[in-house]
Amino acid sequence: NKFPGLGRTGFGETVTLPSGQVVSAYDAKYATYLKLFTGEMFKAYESACIAKGTVQNRTLRNGKAAQFIFTGRMTADYHVPGTPILGSGDPPVAEKIIVMDDLLVSSAFLYDLDETLAHYSLRSEISKKIGHALAEAYDKKIFRVIAKSARTAHPITASPGPEPGGSVIKLGAGNEFNAQALVDAFFEAASILDEKNVPSAGRTAVLSPRQYYALISQVDTNILNRDYGNTQGNLNSGEGLYEIAGISIRRSNNLPFMAGTVGRVDGENNDYSGDFAAHCGLIYQRDAAAVVQGIGPQIQTTGGDVKTMYQGDLIVGRLAMGADWLNPAAAIELQAA
């Protein structure tokens, strides 16, 4: 026993930890399990969530929405002697408001008897499932709004604009897994982003797993750069991060890949709906979309009274966030059309 005598204490009694802290016998007995569970949930969330960090992020404090400001290009003119410089009274400025969706939860009830009879760690498995569920919802929202960003005109239209909007690259019908078509799309995307003066740092491509492996298995290594791994075994296994034309390549099952029409869901305060029948990938820079987050991924469990009444623990993972397009110029959608 980690704490001598703990196994003989009753509910409501206390024990003194080696640190000198006095806690309830129940808290001391189960503290390690809950910490392990929380850690497993965060680990699973972070490993499954690939969109995190590839777009702009804001944490909300005492607010329900975040404001983002766009600025357009300005002109330069020659000064005429004797005339005042008054400046532009209508600078090219626009705003984008991104609100938070309703609270997103993933939960499970862990019955004590099930945990006792199982020959594996139920808490560990459940923690991973909760983490994956939150990460999947997070990624799906972001990838949809990036696709919508690629189809959106820039909000600043004033002179000397309009500013460039999003772009769609069509691979051709049935070419979603064609390696050469994908390579051509990468170089076309790099050219488009350069022509729009989009920063080269933070450029990312997201493909389906089948596209990803078709690409890295068929493309010449002179075109495909690897961040690490120098053997053919690394290439065949898909280990490492790969780049084409300075664009980092990732794979995900959370793209709206040839998904058809995706409707709105109750609780979503941003619009993630759209027709994704021809969608087959994304290439974007981090300014293409933004995420606002009010509550980061957290874990909650019921207390001792509930455990006694129901002979188990209700375990809840929660996340409060919202996402929407930000700068359309930084978003490119690949379509099999």
Give, region by region, the residue ranges found by the protein language model:
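Conserved loop-to-helix interface motifs that mediate assembly, gating, or partner/ligand docking
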Residues: 148, 152, 204, 214-218, ...
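Short, polar/proline-rich extracytoplasmic segments that appear immediately after membrane translocation
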Residues: 89-90, 147
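Short, charged, low-complexity loops and linkers
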Residues: 23-25, 84-89
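Sequence/fold signature of self-assembling virion shell proteins
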Residues: 1-52, 57-75, 94-99, 165-181, ...
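Short, glycine/acidic-enriched capping/hinge loops at junctions between secondary-structure elements
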Residues: 78-84, 327-328
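Structured, hydrophobic secondary-structure cores that serve as assembly/anchoring elements
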Residues: 57, 65-67, 72-73, 86-87, ...
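Alpha-helical scaffold segments that mediate packing/assembly in large oligomeric complexes
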Residues: 115-195, 333-337
